[in-house]
Amino acid sequence: MPVRPALVLSLLVLTPVSAASGASDPSGVWTRGDGNARVRIAPCGGNICATNLWIGDTSGGENVGDRLVLTVSAGGEGTLVGTAYDPQRNLTYSMEMTVKARQLQTRGCVLGGLLCKSVTWSRED
């Protein structure tokens, strides 16, 4: 079962972005390191959502408009930790996001951390 952080993110959603420090704010448009996905991370309700804006190869089951709902909180210097819920697949991932000025590192895990995937993203905006 592959972990899909392209919604961010495969990767995120916990508390509002404003609850995290400005340096840890993942809001914005991000391009996945392999160039196959572009997502927007923004507040949605009381959470954060990562929404696919563009997918180059949809054979992996990812589609434009797919969304991850992230529940995250500050976990240390520039790091957010929590869960990401994928409503399209009814899956919840544990996740960690490390936010830098122009880079986002996401790590999502399932099965109690037995199956994990890390993805690097570059800020577009």
Please identify what each model-predicted range represents:
Residues 26-95:
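Central antiparallel beta-sheet cores of small beta-barrel/beta-sandwich binding domains
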Residues 43-46, 98-102, 122-125:
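A short, sequence-level motif marking secondary-structure junctions
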Residues 6-16:
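Bacterial N-terminal signal peptides
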Residues 23-25, 78, 100-102:
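A short, compositionally biased
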Residues 111-125:
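Edge beta-strand at a domain terminus
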Residues 19-29, 125:
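N-terminal helix-cap/turn-to-beta initiation motif at the start of protein domains
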Residues 94-115:
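Short, exposed beta-strand-loop hairpins at the edges of beta-sheets
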Residues 1-5:
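Positively charged n-region of N-terminal signal peptides that target proteins for export
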